[in-house]
Amino acid sequence: MSWLSKLMPSGIRTDNTPSKKRSVPEGLWEKCSNCGSALYRPELEENLEVCPKCGHHMAIRARARLAALFDADSTTEIAARLGPTDLLKFKDQKKYSERIKIAQKNTGEYDALIAMRGLLKGRALVASSFDFAFMGGSMGSVVGERFSLAAETAVEIGAPYVCFSQSGGARMQEGLFSLMQMAKTSAALGKLREAGLPFISVLTHPTTGGVSASFAMLGDINIAEPQALIGFAGPRVIEQTVREKLPEGFQRSEFLLEHGAIDQICDRREMRDRLADLLAMLGRQPAPEVA
C-alpha cells in the first residue's frame, strides 16, 4: 500500500486496478432498430416485440405470434413433423441439405411455416404464421403443404382461416417445386371459398416475392401491420430497373392502403381483438367479449 493510499478515505481508489463489474445476463436488453431506445427484453416480449417508445414493429417468431392469437391451451399443431428434403441435390455456396440442418438447429423448427387449429375467444379457428428466422421465411414444398393442409383442416371443421405472411418469396433451392406452391396454395383457398369460409390474410414486414404474388393477397380481407414492406420485387430492384426515384413510402403498408391494395392496417397488439371482431362479422355472429 502506498503512502497516498494510507491518507485517502476508505472506498476511494488510487490505482488503476479495474473494479469488479456486476454481471448482466446476455440478451436482457435489446436496441430498437427504429428509434434506438434500449428495451428490456421481458417487457418487449410482453409487448409482442413492438417498441413501447416509438411503436416500431420488430420481428416476432411464429409461435409467439400464434400464442398471442389463440386462447390459452386450445391449440393443436398441423403437420408438425413435416420437414423438407433436398430433391434437386441443390448446391450454391453450401448444399441445400446443409442449409436445412443449420436453419432447423438455429430455429428449432422443421420449416418456415407453423400451422395450428384452436380457439379464438371460444370460436374455432385455423391459423398459420411464417417464421422469417427460417431461411427468410422462404416458401418451399413443406410450406405449401402445411398451408394447404391448414386450409383443408378449416374446411373439415368449418372454421375460418388466418395466415400471417412474412417471407422473402419462393425458395430458390427447390426450383420449380417451390414455384408450384404458388398455384397449390391458391387452389387450396379455392376450396375454402367453395365452402363459404372466410380467409383473412395478415401481411407483415416483409411480404415479398412468390408469397405476395399468390395467397398473401387473396384474403377476403387483407390486413397489414404498420410500415410493412409489401410487394413482389424490392424497391431497390425496381429503382434499378426503371431508373427512376420511387415515391416516399412506396410499397409500405400505408402506401398500399392509400392506393386500395389492402383493406386496413392494424397494430400487432390489437390484432387478436380485430381478427375476432372481423371473423364474427363475416360469420354473422355476435361480437365476442373483449378478452
UniProtKB/Swiss-Prot annotation:
EC number: 2.1.3.15
Cofactor: Zn(2+)
Region (Disordered): 1-23
Predominant cellular place of this UniProt entry's protein: cytoplasm
GO CC field: acetate CoA-transferase complex
GO terms of molecular function: acetyl-CoA carboxylase activity; ATP binding; carboxyl- or carbamoyltransferase activity; zinc ion binding
Domain CoA carboxyltransferase N-terminal residue range list: 28-291
UniProt superkingdom: Bacteria
InterPro entries associated with the record: AcCoA_carboxyl_beta, Acetyl_CoA_COase_Trfase_b_su, ClpP/crotonase-like_dom_sf, COA_CT_N, Znf-ACC
Catalytic function, reaction form: N(6)-carboxybiotinyl-L-lysyl-[protein] + acetyl-CoA = N(6)-biotinyl-L-lysyl-[protein] + malonyl-CoA
Binding-site residues, Zn(2+): 32, 35, 51, 54
PROSITE patterns in alphabetical order: COA_CT_NTER
Ribosomal protein listed as a keyword: no
Family: Belongs to the AccD/PCCB family.
Protein name: Acetyl-coenzyme A carboxylase carboxyl transferase subunit beta
